[in-house]
């Protein structure tokens, strides 16, 4: 794997040779297998990630059942911010649901990077703000739309997930049982028939 994080960052902002060396040292790219957990509930997040290839889901276990709260695909930052910043136990899991390639940044290395090169803080802040906006939209949709409307929004805004993610994970993300998701899909398909 010849890809380096500097290749991706250079698309967003120019990097000096020194900065290239530093970011490639502090932010290694690692491969993770499908099913591998990046974070467990109750542990402290000491790393954040940037998804280069693959799909990661965030989920919680509520009353013994998994509830998916987010899917992270190529180009998405992956962070348990409260745990990472406050050094408090996480209340969720991060699981690779495909073989994944992620850039990995440890908290201490992030601080070194910001202290040495402040321009990276603005880049990371922008990424976090975009992810925060996505989270707000997910919450708003969950509170104001019924499962069929949420499915249609997912179909419109993130259609790749419908092909990549197992139906049972999609169902928990939408807040329904897999059987209900099957009925929703059939209803939509029936309505869309010519």
Stretches with model-predicted labels:
Residues 1-28, 83:
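Cyclic nucleotide-binding regulatory module and flanking cytosolic helices
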Residues 28, 55-60, 101-102:
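Short beta-strand segments in beta-sandwich/barrel cores
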Residues 35, 46-57, 74-75:
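Glycine- and acidic-residue-biased ligand/ion/polar-headgroup-sensing regions
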Residues 38-43:
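Short phosphate-coordinating micro-motif centered on Lys-Gly-acidic
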Residues 67-126:
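Cyclic-nucleotide recognition modules
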Residues 145-194:
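Phosphate-/nucleic-acid-contacting segments
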């Amino acid at each position: 794997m010849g890809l380096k994080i500097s290749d991706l960052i250079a698309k967003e902002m120019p990097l000096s040779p020194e900065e290239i060396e530093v970011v490639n040292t502090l932010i290694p790219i690692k491969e993770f297998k499908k099913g591998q957990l990046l974070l467990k509930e109750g542990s402290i997040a000491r790393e954040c990630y940037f998804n280069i290839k693959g799909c990661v889901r965030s989920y919680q276990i509520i009353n013994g059942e998994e509830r998916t709260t987010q899917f992270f695909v190529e180009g998405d930052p992956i962070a348990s911010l409260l745990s990472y910043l406050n050094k408090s136990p996480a209340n969720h899991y991060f699981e690779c649901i495909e073989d994944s390639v992620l850039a990995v940044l440890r908290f201490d290395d992030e601080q070194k990077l910001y202290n040495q090169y402040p321009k990276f803080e603005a880049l990371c802040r922008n990424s976090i703000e975009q992810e925060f906006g996505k989270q707000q939209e997910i919450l708003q949709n969950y509170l104001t739309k019924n499962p069929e409307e949420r499915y249609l929004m997912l179909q419109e805004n993130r259609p790749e997930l419908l092909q990549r993610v197992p139906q049972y994970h999609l169902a928990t993300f939408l807040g329904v049982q897999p059987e209900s998701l099957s009925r929703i899909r059939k209803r939509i398909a029936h309505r869309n028939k010519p």
